[in-house]
């Protein structure tokens, strides 16, 4: 289909990037693949929610990609992306020794986003759980060492791009910590608080899901403070537009924006700071340059996610369009917009599914918890074996 001289460069080594590698090989594209990332490990972030309870450790959710890269004949370049130039054909990479220039024929950008830290006191007085396994372990250790007190959990968004939010995991941390404390016989010593600036938190999951999540909080005796924007986080409290909420431990998932290196480029940007893409995951105005996952801003429904499963779907579409281009055809594959989420609580889960045809929410049951664990094992098998 293509010559072996075709060089496909992938920036990042997360969900979207690795799915792109697999799809390229699955479609038998005869191309050299170079992956650029700071390390050759995958952290399975969806399972971070099990770290506070000890159901998962950092080692459990870490995958060494050395064998995967060797099997898929991938050249891995350890480094940080500094710049992308020449409409995607040139990438500047900062390695341990120097900044090098790497050229390509096709580029896939999948470096992820970064959490906004503009909320005063966030960096000093709160933990952003999904920043990595070290934060998951920190949450575990902090709660283990507490004899009681108030744990407050909430999330925010990017006001210029409301889709750039990680609400689902915060519901899982909330319910999971509640379950853990009950299993430990310590729940009566703790006050759990959920706070959010919206009066309908988690709207991306659908109205029925929001109702169900709020109902679950009330059932679990979780104090709900919604509809007032957080103004700052202090050492012992959250200050909102309406009130002050005392807290001994704060977990807060802020909204996301694009990675810092984008500021060095001429890549088209959305108002929220992401790379502007079309429905085929093409970077607008940059030929043979694609973006998948959290780094991009895409057309689609207001509930469109960008991470994990959706990043996989975008990577599949991007590679299908690359195959078209290399064969001299017009790219014809739009990415599928689909949201699948199991809101887990350590021993049970609530299933949420959305696409352009339907929105489905199924009540909590043990089957969904085990389904989430099965999917974790199935997903990681491709990279561990």
Language model features by range: what are they?
Residues 2-75, 161-203:
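Beta1-alpha1 glycine-rich phosphate/pyrophosphate-binding loop at the start
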Residues 30-34, 71-91, 102, 178-276, ...:
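A Rossmann-like FAD-binding core segment of flavoenzymes
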Residues 2-6, 73-172, 176-185, 251:
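FAD-binding core/adjacent interface of flavoenzyme oxidoreductases
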Residues 124-147, 237, 244-249, 253-313:
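FAD-site-proximal beta/loop scaffold in flavoenzymes
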Residues 347-385:
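C-terminal auxiliary extensions adjacent to catalytic cores
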Residues 16, 112-115, 256-258:
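Short glycine-rich anion-binding loops that position phosphate/pyrophosphate groups of nucleotides
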Residues 165-167, 295-337, 341-344:
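A conserved FAD-binding loop/helix module that cradles the flavin
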Residues 161-178, 207-212, 307-316, 344-354:
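Short, electropositive alpha-helical surface patch
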């Amino acid at each position: 289909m293509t010559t072996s001289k075709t060089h496909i460069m992938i920036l990042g080594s997360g969900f979207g990037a690795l799915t792109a590698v697999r799809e390229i090989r699955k479609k038998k594209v005869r191309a050299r693949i170079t992956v650029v990332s700071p390390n050759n490990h995958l952290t399975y972030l969806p399972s971070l929610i099990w770290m506070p309870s000890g159901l998962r450790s950092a080692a459990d959710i870490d995958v060494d990609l050395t064998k995967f890269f060797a099997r898929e004949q991938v050249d891995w370049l350890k480094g940080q992306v500094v710049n992308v130039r020449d409409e995607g054909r040139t990438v500047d990479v900062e390695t341990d020794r120097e900044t090098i220039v790497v050229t390509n024929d096709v580029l896939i950008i999948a470096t992820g986003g970064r959490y906004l830290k503009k909320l005063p006191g966030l960096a000093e007085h709160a933990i952003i759980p999904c920043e990595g396994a070290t934060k998951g372990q920190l949450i575990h250790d902090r709660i283990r060492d507490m004899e009681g007190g108030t744990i407050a959990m909430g999330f925010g968004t990017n006001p210029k791009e409301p889709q750039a939010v990680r609400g689902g995991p915060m519901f899982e941390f909330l319910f999971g910590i509640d379950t853990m404390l009950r299993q430990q016989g310590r729940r009566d010593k703790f006050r759990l608080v959920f706070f959010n600036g919206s009066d309908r938190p988690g709207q991306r999951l659908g109205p029925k899901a929001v109702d169900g999540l709020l109902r679950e909080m009330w059932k679990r005796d979780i104090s709900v403070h919604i509809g007032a924007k957080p103004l700052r986080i202090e050492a012992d409290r959250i200050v909102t537009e309406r009130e002050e909420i005392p807290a001994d431990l704060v977990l807060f998932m802020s909204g996301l924006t694009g990675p810092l290196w984008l500021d060095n480029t001429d890549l088209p940007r959305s108002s929220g700071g992401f790379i502007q893409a079309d429905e085929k995951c093409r970077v607008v105005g940059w030929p043979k340059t694609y973006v998948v996952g959290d780094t991009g801003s895409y057309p689609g429904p207001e509930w469109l996610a960008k991470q994990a499963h959706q990043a996989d779907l975008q990577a599949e579409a991007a590679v299908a369009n690359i195959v078209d281009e290399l064969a001299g055809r017009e790219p014809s594959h739009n990415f599928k917009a689909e949201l699948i989420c199991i809101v887990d609580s350590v021993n049970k889960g609530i299933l949420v599914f959305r696409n352009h045809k339907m929105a489905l929410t199924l009540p909590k049951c043990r089957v969904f918890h085990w389904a989430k664990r099965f999917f974790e094992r199935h997903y990681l098998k491709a990279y561990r074996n």
